[in-house]
Swiss-Prot record:
Keyword Repressor assigned: no
Leader sequence segment: none
This enzyme's EC code(s): 7.1.1.-
Record keywords: Cell inner membrane, Cell membrane, Membrane, NAD, Quinone, Translocase, Transmembrane, Transmembrane helix, Ubiquinone
Quaternary context: NDH-1 is composed of 13 different subunits. Subunits NuoA, H, J, K, L, M, N constitute the membrane sector of the complex.
The protein's name in its UniProt record: NADH-quinone oxidoreductase subunit H
Catalysed reaction equations from the record: a quinone + NADH + 5 H(+)(in) = a quinol + NAD(+) + 4 H(+)(out)
Similarity annotation: Belongs to the complex I subunit 1 family.
Length: 335
């Protein structure tokens, strides 16, 4: 009797895929910080990082070395266990959420029938990480930043979920691969669910606390917010986690609204990974462009925008989608 049964081999291959994908996401998140700084320098007509290596390409390695050798300091009056746990939860929740993304027809960590619900469960965990960081730091700026972040995230996650319910109503499934295959046979959801796409994209920027929704860490008001007391590798986990969040939301936008790994009109299906990577890179660049071009609004304006504009628009989109699906569904006679 051998240990290497087909079931065991499938488990081993799944674990290998998970390790490769998650390591690639972490490396991409670290590299994205360099890409953002270079693009911001280009768009703002100035030099970006250009001292370390050719074209500054080794700047990220220098930053990582500096971060690694910095003192791993913990405030004396902080709750040390929760203070240490917060960055671990923040980064782990984002990496685990990435497990549901089908990158190609054969590459993906988990094919869950509750894929979308799993994503929202992991997104909810990130709220706890921010609260842990703010409360355990024993710093008023950190606490205020964490309260802002939790209120903003919870508010925008409400209609983030409602924005995707129109897709679920049309497909009849929470499975990510089912959603991608439905788009291959029909229109990409960017067309029938355009308003759902707009509200989901806005919510994605807000949930990742990216500019212009970076109120929880507004330097002018809160002195860097909930991670003001963090240094060294703990701060680095928050820093890289933010870029992993950008990659996650961009990959979700591609999967849910732009056909996933499929090219436009089914062109070159053998280049599934290339299509997925190109579309994801486009949205990552859009995240960076928002930082370079839009001013930061006041916090009350951010919250009013979510409840008074985005939520009604999302509800109208969901109701119209449900009405159209019911209208096109043939009636079933009751025996």
């Amino acid at each position: 009797m051998t240990w290497f049964t087909p079931e065991v081999i499938d488990v081993i291959l799944t674990v290998i895929k998970a390790i490769v994908i998650l390591l690639a996401v972490v490396v991409a998140g670290a590299l994205l910080s360099f890409v953002e700084r270079r693009l911001l320098g280009w768009w703002q007509d100035r030099y970006g990082p250009n001292r370390v290596g050719p074209f500054g390409m080794f700047q990220i390695a220098a930053d990582m070395l500096k971060m690694f050798f910095k003192e791993d300091w913990t405030p004396p009056f902080a709750d040390k266990v929760i203070f240490t746990l917060a960055p671990v939860v923040a980064m782990s929740a984002l990496l685990i959420a990435f497990a549901i993304i089908p990158i190609t027809p054969t590459w993906g960590v988990a094919d869950l029938n509750i894929g979308l619900l799993f994503f929202f469960a992991m997104a909810g965990l990130s709220v706890y990480a921010v609260l842990f960081a703010g409360w355990s730091s024993n710093n008023k700026f950190a606490l205020l930043g964490s309260l802002r972040a939790s209120a903003q995230t919870v508010s925008y996650e409400v209609f983030m979920g409602l924005a995707l319910m129109g897709i679920v109503v049309q497909v009849g499934s929470f499975n990510m691969r089912d959603i991608v295959e439905y788009q291959a046979q029909n229109l990409w959801f960017i067309i029938p669910q355009f308003f759902g796409f707009c509200t989901f994209f806005i919510a994605g920027v807000a949930v990742t606390h990216r500019h212009p929704f970076d109120q929880p860490e507004a330097e002018q008001e809160l002195a860097d917010g909930y991670h003001i007391e963090y240094a060294g590798m703990k701060w680095g986990m928050f820093f890289v986690g933010e870029y992993i969040g950008i990659i996650l939301i961009s990959a979700l936008l591609v999967t849910l609204f732009f056909g996933g790994w499929h090219g436009p009109f089914g062109i070159l299906p053998q280049l599934s990974f290339v299509w997925f990577a190109l579309k994801t890179a486009f949205f990552i660049l859009l995240f960076i462009l928002l930082r370079a071009s839009i001013p930061r609004p006041r916090y009350d304006q951010v919250m009013d925008f979510s409840w008074k504009f985005c939520l009604p628009l999302t509800l109208i989109n969901l109701l119209v989608t449900a009405a159209i699906v019911l209208w096109n569904t043939p009636a079933v006679a009751v025996q």
